[in-house]
């Protein structure tokens, strides 16, 4: 299995695995995910708990012994269910928020840090490749911030909420409004075989 970790952030959070179908773009990974329903209700197996014991004394001084655990939970209400994204749950991603101005400021710093990191790698001394990566990321950011596009996105950090790390984007495509799609800057991910 391949695990993709945050390359730039201090905590190197897990952000993605190859358990998900990854569509490789020029500078991004795009991942279709799904919403799943989680049950908040607790199932109690009174056989494993052994039941509870309670005593009552009636007017005739008769003692009644009760060992039915269900009596103890008679007035407890069901907690219900909730929806969560399967990728968010599996990798403990944390939703955060940006307005256009703060996201643009974040991306300027992130791109700078990412390009500096890439330049420091001995295998990445090709200036044309570095320029291609930088322009590709800038083009992606420009497109996602254009007009009303920005409002379509939700933002997620790794579990440590590292402010220097990669922020994943989630949106719903116009042609597939029921499938949440995540977008990651692929050069900001470190692939690890586990």
Swiss-Prot record:
UniProt keyword list: Calcium, Cytoplasm
Stored SUPFAM superfamilies: Mss4-like
Entry keyword Cytoplasm: yes
Gene Ontology terms: cellular component: cytoplasm; cytosol
GO terms classed as biological process: asexual reproduction; exocytosis; negative regulation of autophagy; negative regulation of gene expression; pinocytosis; positive regulation of gene expression; sorocarp development; sorocarp spore cell differentiation
Principal subcellular localization: cytoplasm
Localization in the cell: Cytoplasm
InterPro entries membership: Mss4-like_sf (IPR011057), Mss4/transl-control_tumour (IPR011323), TCTP (IPR034737), Translational_control_tumour_p (IPR018105)
Limits of the TCTP domain: 1-194
GO molecular function: calcium ion binding
Source organism, top-level taxon: Eukaryota
Family: Belongs to the TCTP family.
Function: Involved in calcium binding and microtubule stabilization.
Protein's name in the database: Translationally-controlled tumor protein homolog 2
């Amino acid at each position: 299995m391949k695990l993709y970790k945050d390359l730039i952030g201090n905590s190197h959070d897990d952000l993605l695995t190859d358990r998900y179908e990854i569509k490789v773009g020029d500078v991004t990974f795009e991942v279709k995910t799904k919403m799943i329903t989680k049950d908040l209700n607790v199932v109690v197996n009174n056989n494993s708990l052994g039941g509870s014991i309670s005593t009552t004394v009636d007017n005739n001084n008769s003692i009644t012994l009760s060992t039915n655990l269900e009596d103890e939970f008679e007035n407890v209400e069901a907690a219900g269910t909730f929806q969560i994204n399967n990728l968010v749950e599996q990798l403990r991603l944390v939703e955060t928020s940006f307005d256009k101005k703060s996201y643009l400021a974040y991306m300027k710093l992130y791109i700078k840090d990412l390009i500096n990191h890439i330049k420091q790698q001995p295998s990445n001394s090709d200036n044309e490749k570095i320029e291609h990566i930088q322009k590709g990321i800038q083009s992606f950011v420009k497109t996602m911030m254009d007009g009303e596009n920005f409002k379509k996105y939700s933002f997620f950090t790794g579990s440590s909420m590292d402010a220097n790390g990669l922020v994943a984007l989630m949106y719903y495509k116009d042609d597939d409004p029921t499938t949440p799609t995540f977008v990651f800057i692929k050069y900001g991910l470190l692939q690890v075989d586990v």
